Amino acid sequence: MVKYGVVGTGYFGAELARYMQKNDGAEITLLYDPDNAEAIAEELGAKVASSLDELVSSDEVDCVIVATPNNLHKEPVIKAAQHGKNVFCEKPIALSYQDCREMVDACKENNVTFMAGHIMNFFNGVHHAKELINQGVIGDVLYCHTARNGWEEQQPSVSWKKIREKSGGHLYHHIHELDCVQFLMGGMPETVTMTGGNVAHEGEHFGDEDDMIFVNMEFSNKRFALLEWGSAYRWGEHYVLIQGSKGAIRLDLFNCKGTLKLDGQESYFLIHESQEEDDDRTRIYHSTEMDGAIAYGKPGKRTPLWLSSVIDKEMRYLHEIMEGAPVSEEFAKLLTGEAALEAIATADACTQSMFEDRKVKLSEIVK
């Protein structure tokens, strides 16, 4: 039996706990969240810890799942590692490369597993795209273009996710696409340039994050990527487009469908595990449930069908690793800290680029 403790049991943390508990040989034993732990503890038959220290030092915990707000990941990860606990941490791992480095180093020094919650890697369509690329089907990857944008209306209250100091803004909080591009390109770019600003969401009823950002990445061997995020787009889009020397792949997460284009012919594949899940995601994007290209959850709310399925898949993989299964090559970077470090390093370089109005080399961040 592998015993799990969860730090942060709001919307996403509670769902991670629920789906981990479904696995044979997995038990959620201890929860820590001063505001939200009681209800999910009662549901799962777990105990509530009175402090973070109580949870990470407990003999009833083998692995700690960290799902606090983004700016509060560092302390539980490092304390868990220092107590010899394996760690799963939600994305973004940290809001600075230095913090991320300290978290990864703490896990290495204490010889514990550290898994980054970069959940997009568990999408069926992303896995299939990686397979096609590795098999040389579309030739050499020359260029990637991602967009994750929509229009955000005023909300009853300002979520922590809209406060840059707490979430990191779109760049860090929605780091999935950046991470995905770096997986597809084989690592970090050599240089980045970021521009953007808050063009339509200023005032007391909104947070302080930029609602339009644009990132240009330059990789080795004349390869490029363009990424855009934001909540000031009346024409919403969400996709990853991969241009190769022989063909192209489009992962459309708005009108949910994967497309392979070769020799002028198109073939299609699922983004998620079933047509029902793809249709569920398409329906949500075209309904009023989305806001600014993201459905912001809140404690007590359940994830939609497509997201529940991929959480289930991610938690099942984590549990298999905890039970001693070998780490697959595809996900190796998620369990060495490399994916976490590369994603945050690039995000930091982008942030520096915008504030200093210049192109930034990744070597300035990763020294």
From Swiss-Prot:
Pfam families per UniProt: GFO_IDH_MocA, GFO_IDH_MocA_C
GO molecular function: nucleotide binding; oxidoreductase activity
Keywords: Oxidoreductase
Organism superkingdom: Bacteria
EC assignment: 1.-.-.-
SUPFAM superfamilies per the UniProt record, alphabetical: Glyceraldehyde-3-phosphate dehydrogenase-like, C-terminal domain (SSF55347), NAD(P)-binding Rossmann-fold domains (SSF51735)
EC primary class: oxidoreductase
PANTHER family: BILIVERDIN REDUCTASE A (PTHR43377:SF1)
Recorded family membership: Belongs to the Gfo/Idh/MocA family.
Protein name per the record: Uncharacterized oxidoreductase SP_1686
